[in-house]
Every structure is written in C-alpha cells, then in structure tokens.
C-alpha cells in the first residue's frame, strides 16, 4: 500500500466539491481575455499522429525571461532569492477540471493510482486526522457514499503520475516550478506576496479559496468549505486563475532546496514539487498560497486537495 508523504514544511492539504458562490461571478471570470490562447481542436504532430487537445483548455502565453525566484520574507525553503530564466511557454489559464479529466478517462480508459490502490488521502474531520479513505477517487472525492465531484471544479485525487499521463494525452506537459512561479507573478519581478496582490481579503471580499477558522470549527467566509469552481475568484494580471488556494498543483520538477539553502532534504526524484496552497488548513498559513510558497509530495500520492494544470513549450511571439 502506498504511503502518504507528509514530510514537507507545509501541512499537506485536501480538496473536493463545495458551496457555490455567485453564478454570475463564476461566469464573468470564465470569459477569455485577448492574451489567452484557445485550444479546443485537435492538432497533428510532426509524426502525423493525432495529438488530442483537451476541451476548453485555454492557455496563456509568456515570452519568458529572467526573474527573482523565492522570497526572503517567506518560509525557510523559499530562500534565498535567486535569479532564474525561463524560455517562452504556454500555461493553462486554470487547473484541469473534473469535466476535462473525465474526457481523458472516457477516451483512454485510464485508471488513476487512487483507483488502482483502492484509496486516497482525505482529512477526517471527526477524527481530526488524515486517512486513506477506501473508494475516494477523482469522481467521488469523499468516497463512494459522498457526493460526485463537480464538473467545473479542479480535479483532485490525482497523483503526479496521473497528471503526467493526462498532460501527455493532451499534447502538453506539467509546468516547471520556475514557470509556475513566473506565471503566478504575471511574468514580473513584483514584490507582491500573492498572485493577485498583498491581501487575502479586503472588506470581507476574498481573492482566493483559502481556509478560515480553526481546524475543528471551519468557517466559510470566502463562500466555500472545499473546492470552488475554477475562476470563481477572478484572474491575476496575466489572466490566470487559481494561482493561490483552491488546490495544490503538481509541477514537473522533483523537490530540492534552492541553491545556497542548506535545508536538510535528500533529493529524491520521486518526490515532486507542488505549488499554490489549497482551500484546506495549513500550518504555514498564508505562506502556503504565496507566489513563492512551495511544498512536496511523492509521485504516487493522491489527496483531495491536490490537482494540476498543464503547460507546453512555445516559440517567442
């Protein structure tokens, strides 16, 4: 049986269906901007093999360039700030949704690792502890007796391996950790803590799906207890949604300390980076969903607060 890897500086989190905010707001936030690339029709590879492009998977183009990665004001694993250069790339406007993942499964017959193992990581509120819940899957995030996953919410209970399989099918890949942070910063060397600014909320209006209240008495000031529809909290300056909170997101890289950081972590190619933070309680608080916030988990682990978005290489426009 797989082990849930709970070894990061962050307290690893969870995700699923939740209370709905204004339908009008969600609809407004789902409208594509002029710098969003829509890719809804199949393409052909140079080998003349069909490459499927997932439906409604709008992507945002970044020219690439250099930026200062990390934060001197963040957690120890975010230091030191160091210069990184990324090449031009596209990244999905939003995390992959339940609906998009369902099409992948229907076309390919793919089985996630949670389905193969027969369980997946869920936080048990009654017992106030994590558990491997039998039957918890991407389509039944709280197990067979729980509600169905909602189509427009980010897919969860997917391992890094599952995410890579989807990305390969869609003719894409997972973003590198540097690409993810560059996109979260809207391609700028901004000093803002979050993808949207410096505050989690202003006058009771929340900018992301995050945890409120103590772990044993959760509140829903942002309108959701668990996951929210992608885009429900608007976009960053670059036109991306959910670049902080809602669900943790897998990155392509294995986890390692930044250059010059003596963090006592042995590099393991099977331990992958996750970014974004999620809707669930985190001991590191707001630092988990800061643009520089980073954590890790094993490549075969699936949790109900972890999903992903895709990226792909691009030529400079």
Per-range role (PLM):
Residues 25, 61-62, 68, 73, ...:
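Functional-site microenvironments in short loops/helix caps that host divalent-cation chemistry
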Residues 4-12:
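Sec-dependent N-terminal signal peptides
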Residues 16-136, 140-141, 161, 188, ...:
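Short, compositionally biased
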């Amino acid at each position: 049986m797989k082990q849930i890897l709970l070894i990061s500086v962050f307290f690893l989190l969870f995700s699923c269906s939740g209370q709905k905010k204004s339908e009008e707001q969600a609809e407004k936030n789902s409208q594509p901007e002029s710098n969003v690339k829509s890719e809804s029709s199949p393409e052909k590879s140079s080998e003349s093999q069909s490459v499927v492009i997932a439906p409604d998977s709008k992507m945002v183009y970044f020219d690439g360039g250099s930026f200062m990665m990390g934060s001197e004001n963040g957690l120890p694993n975010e230091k030191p700030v160091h210069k990184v250069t990324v090449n031009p790339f596209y990244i999905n406007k939003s995390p992959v949704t339940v609906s998009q993942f369902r099409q992948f499964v229907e076309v390919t017959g793919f089985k996630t690792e949670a389905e193969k193992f027969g369980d997946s990581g869920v936080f048990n509120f009654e017992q106030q502890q994590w558990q491997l819940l039998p039957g918890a899957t991407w389509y039944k995030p709280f197990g067979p007796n729980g509600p169905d996953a909602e189509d427009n919410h980010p897919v969860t209970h997917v391992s890094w391996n599952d995410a890579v399989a989807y990305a390969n099918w869609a003719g894409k890949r997972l973003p590198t950790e540097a690409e993810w942070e560059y996109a979260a910063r809207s391609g700028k060397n901004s000093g803002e803590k979050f993808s949207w600014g410096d505050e989690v909320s202003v006058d009771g209006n929340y900018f992301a799906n995050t945890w409120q209240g103590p772990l044993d008495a959760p509140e829903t000031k942002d309108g959701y207890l668990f996951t929210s529809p992608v885009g429900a909290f608007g976009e960053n300056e670059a036109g991306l949604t959910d670049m902080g909170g809602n669900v943790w997101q897998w990155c392509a890289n294995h986890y390692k300390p930044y250059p010059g950081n003596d963090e006592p972590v042995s590099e393991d190619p099977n331990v992958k980076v996750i970014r974004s933070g999620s809707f669930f309680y985190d001991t590191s608080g707001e630092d988990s969903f800061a643009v520089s916030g980073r954590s890790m988990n094993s490549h075969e682990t699936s949790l109900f607060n972890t999903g992903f978005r895709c990226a792909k290489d691009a030529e400079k426009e």
